[in-house]
Amino acid sequence: MKTLIHNDWQTVLEPVFESPEYAQLHAFLKEEYATKTIYPEMHHIFQAFEWTPFHDVKVVILGQDPYHNPRQAVGASFAVAPGVALPPSLQNIYKELQSDLGYPPVHHGYLKAWADQGVLLLNAVLTVQAGEAYSHQNHGWEELTDAAIAALSARGGVVFILWGNAAKKKAAVIDTSKNAIIASAHPSPLSASRGFFGSRPFSRTNAALEKMGEAPINWQLPETVKAD
């Protein structure tokens, strides 16, 4: 079995990687990357898992699929590379972070400081065709990310932040007896005013972590960063 993720996620997801469904997904992606512009770059597909090993995960921020404009997607939900303009959803996340905890927005969207503390920045679908949102839905990614969420849920002690209807569907595979769910509208400009703003996800996540005996996340991002 080829190593796709260089930490304990490889073992956790091995049954998926060895499944016929993943073989079909792999064949689909091989053709897509050969003939179209696909984001993120192939070596960044599993970046969220690389940044935050399974045994370190305390929080999951679940997105839908990667950004589909040039230079944006880095393989981690809502994050962009240093030097890339902040997408509107991330601008709204920063506004809510300031409203919730008082941290002023930083001028980059590189969220690795969160990932380093145990925040898994996971999209439900890990690839997308340029300019075509949701174009890689229903090709097999959902089974892999469901398996990742189910494994974390079984381990327990995780706060799942579910923004928007697609993310909320993942609640079906989360055991709420030993994990916490914080759900609201999506931070996109289309829906942020319908329940995302004012939802205080950051302080509520830290309260849930402390209730489970875990250390809180320092949500304040550094002003200067460089990409790994």
Curated annotation (Swiss-Prot):
Alphabetical keyword list: Cytoplasm, DNA damage, DNA repair, Hydrolase
Subcellular compartments: Cytoplasm
Entry annotation: catalytic residues: D65 (proton acceptor)
SUPFAM superfamilies for the chain: Uracil-DNA glycosylase-like
EC number: 3.2.2.27
InterPro entries documented for this protein: UDG_fam1, Ura-DNA_Glyclase_AS, Uracil-DNA_glycosylase-like, Uracil-DNA_glycosylase-like_sf
Keyword DNA damage: yes
GO biological process: base-excision repair, AP site formation via deaminated base removal
Enzyme superclass (EC): hydrolase
Domain of life: Bacteria
Pfam families in alphabetical order: UDG (PF03167)
GO cellular component: a single term: cytoplasm
Catalytic reaction list: Hydrolyzes single-stranded DNA or mismatched double-stranded DNA and polynucleotides, releasing free uracil
Chief location of this protein within or outside the cell: cytoplasm
NCBIfam families: PRK05254.1-1 (NF003588), PRK05254.1-2 (NF003589), PRK05254.1-4 (NF003591), PRK05254.1-5 (NF003592), ung (TIGR00628)
Family according to the record: Belongs to the uracil-DNA glycosylase (UDG) superfamily. UNG family.
PANTHER family: URACIL-DNA GLYCOSYLASE
Function as written in the Swiss-Prot or TrEMBL entry: Excises uracil residues from the DNA which can arise as a result of misincorporation of dUMP residues by DNA polymerase or due to deamination of cytosine.
Protein name from the UniProt record: Uracil-DNA glycosylase
Source species taxonomy: Bacteria, Bacillati, Bacillota, Bacilli, Lactobacillales
